[in-house]
Amino acid sequence: MRAGKHVVLYVEDDADYQDMVREILEAADFEMVAASSAEEGIRAWDTEKPDLVIVDLMMEEVDAGTSLITDLRARGCDVPIYMLSSVGDDLAMSMDYGALGLAGVFQKPIDGRSLITILKARLD
């Protein structure tokens, strides 16, 4: 938390989607730190220490999101991590949340109200 706002690290390679999620989060009084790749996400985690992380499943590689989550957990990241995916419900059904340490999966296109409701419930 910084200046009374929860800090969310959002790792997403689509700039338009980053902008959209930033608008949703900032309207709900969150602060968003954006990273455009898994590598940037690691650096942002190391410097920002956010309260929560949202990771896009498919970035520069098909499973870059799952690799990033594994790397973050190995670095001691103990905050809730959510995955964002456009793959569909098959992913949600096949994903081993326990193995990845995920708090959940959001589907694209994301519903802003649901996102905020879930994040606030998790952080407050």
Regions found by a protein language model. Give the residues of each.
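Non-catalytic signal-transmission and effector/linker regions of two-component phosphorelay proteins
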Residues: 1-9, 74, 107, 111-124
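Two-component/phosphorelay signaling modules centered on CheY-like receiver
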Residues: 14-33, 100
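Helix N-cap/capping motif at the beta->alpha junctions
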Residues: 34-43, 64-65
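Conserved phosphotransfer cores of two-component systems
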Residues: 46-48, 71-78, 100
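Active-site residues of response regulator receiver
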Residues: 56-57
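Alpha4 helix (beta4-alpha4-beta5 surface) of REC/receiver domains from two-component response regulators
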Residues: 63-67, 74, 88-106, 113, ...
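Hydrophobic/aromatic residues positioned on beta-strands within the core alpha/beta folds
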Residues: 84-85
